[in-house]
Amino acid sequence: MDYEFKKNILDGHYYCHCSMDHEIVGRWVQEEIGKESTKIAQVLALIVAARSNPTEELCLNGTEISLMICGDEVTVQDNALLHSYELEAESEFELYDCESVACCGLEDFEQLIQQWQLFVRR
């Protein structure tokens, strides 16, 4: 998974852009953890817990996007997609799955979070 971080010098907002098929991961980083050190620490602690309990699924439910870790697999999914599956609603306006869910390895995800932490501290 490739990614790039940017900071808007005019308004101070931080941005995380991830490669195609991982766009939702970038959105999750921006919208759910942002530059808040406590949230970043919470995610890093969840990664440590996942390594200690590889058979347990660990979740961090966000306002719009949620994170799930099971073993060495990380899934980031738009909450609206979860609700659309629950409701089994068929609609031409349903979210495009590829932009609403992404999976990556735990090591890649941990590296992304660590690099994000360093970037927002600058």
UniProtKB/Swiss-Prot annotation:
InterPro entries: UPF0231. Pfam families: UPF0231 (PF06062). Transmembrane segments: none annotated. Belongs to the UPF0231 family. This is UPF0231 protein VV2750. It comes from Vibrio vulnificus (strain YJ016).
